[in-house]
Amino acid sequence: MISESQGGLMSAFTTPPKFSGFIRRLVEEGYVNAQNMQQALEKAKKFKQDIVPYLIDNFSISPLTIAEIISLEFGEPLLDLGVFDPALFLKDKIDEKLIQKYRIMPLVHRGHVLYVATSNPTNIEAMDAIRFNSKLKVEPIIVEHDKLERLLSEHFVEETHFNFDTEELDLDVEVDPHTTDDDDEDDKLKDEAPIVKYINKLLIDAIRMSASDLHFEPYEKSYRVRYRVDGVLRLIATPPLQLATRLASRLKVMSQMDISEKRVPQDGRIKLKMSKSKTIDFRVNSLPTLFGEKIVLRILDPASAMLGIDALGYEPEQKALFMEALNKPQGMLLITGPTGSGKTVSLYTGLNILNTEHANISTAEDPVEINLEGVNQVNVNPKVGLTFAAALRSFLRQDPDIIMVGEIRDLETAEIAIKAAQTGHLVMSTLHTNNAAETLTRLRNMGVASFNIATSVNLVIAQRLARRLCSQCKRPIQVPERSLLEMGFTPEDLAQPEFQIFEPVGCHDCREGYKGRVGIYEVMKITPEISKIIMEDGNALEIAATAETLGFNNLRRSGLKKVMQGVTSLQEINRVTSE
């Protein structure tokens, strides 16, 4: 029998938490469940972080979604920062330290009222601090968090990493950028605060620009730094050539490489703490080139693996096929595409969906890119005999439910993976092929028996990443009907009343007309018809033709659908898919 006091105690633990304001709306509309929201509020408070960026960083909620919900809750319009002249921002009305601490921007001063842009008008501490500092009444104006952050990064210099100039360095020192002598550079770096600041600035700038890679490149008479943003390399900086060795050495120290070894490539890793609750990893590789060491960093943001399937760009029917394959107790799910096409994010998204307390998940990766809590991840190391095949054999003795292999590269790995898929395990992996049909014939060319391919593979996904048109500046264009038909549009497409194509323009928000990327997918289920072709040793063309008759869109068709939806441009689809 439970006493009254015990009952009260139990109800205290079982009563769902009560939320208010935009937090309540986010929970009610299903963006975050009540338990996760309560934990988010507690962690944000513990880390002294605003709840809005915390939710954006740790859940699949876009800045626009949160801004719209806050706008709805307050009954105030959502402001587009692009309508303001940046030269007129009232940066002198508030102490710069407060602007950086609370991430706000003073916009308009009228009488005794100061209007400030903020992504969270419920931050009472921030409003009070600004009111006290400015001696004015403060009225919040709701804006999107990412746009506000971009604006702040452009207009303010953060003390920790943005007040560096190459003029601070002693460039008169005789430094041979092509030297290979073993210097005591580790000791020198301790005193090179400007170099440290410069590297930190470049790393953080890359994250804020949503870059995927950073390239530090020495040449005979110049040095350059480039970022890959939305799949395209952009020139960012041209530091003096005299800094080449010092920049490379600093990056190698940060990634725990041997700075005295300049003759062979090296791999390393950097962890950059952005806040108390967010850390970004960089995978680093050095390459000895003719004029010094080229360093390339790949940004590994854990948040990219937590986006959720809806953020990847699947069409509804493609998403349904993906989820169906994930929910099967056994079989193989293969993802294919070139390097940089988003295969890893797709795999991790699937693993996150499957990652429950009831599943034993093991992965073999080269290397592990993002740490997933609750998943047993293994870095393959062929030098010591830990190959993909060796890891797979070990997994089968570990009572697995789900196995992920980073890439199927050889017959041994393929055969073990297929054996696992046929004996009660769900296996996920990738290959480098051009489309879904070629993936099946590639396995056969490796030496896998056609019967085993037909009976073990459940689904093949081919994918590309296309740049997403900026919603602020894209504009409609007229293209001759004949040209559209030649590009792959159908007469039925052109007959739709809402048919419209857009092109990039470029604005303050995006600069080049594109902002972000979207996935283009070919999702092919292995049906009885396709299985029959595989077992009869049919070629990729036959498989692709049958898939088309069954209603599976190829990459080109999926891309054209994104064009008709106004998500991307014809130029982008022509770039990432074939006719």
Swiss-Prot record:
Subcellular location: Cytoplasm
NCBIfam families tied to this protein: type_IV_pilB
GO molecular function: ATP binding; ATP hydrolysis activity; metal ion binding
PROSITE patterns recorded: T2SP_E (PS00662)
Residues binding ATP, per UniProt: G340, S341, G342, K343, T344, V345
Top-level lineage group: Bacteria
Lineage: Bacteria, Pseudomonadati, Pseudomonadota, Gammaproteobacteria, Moraxellales
Alphabetical keyword list: ATP-binding, Cytoplasm, Fimbrium biogenesis, Metal-binding, Nucleotide-binding, Zinc
Subunit-structure text: Interacts with CpiA.
Regulation of its activity: Inhibited by the inhibitory protein CpiA.
Name of the protein in its database record: Type IV pilus assembly ATPase PilB
Any GO CC annotation of this UniProt entry: cytoplasm
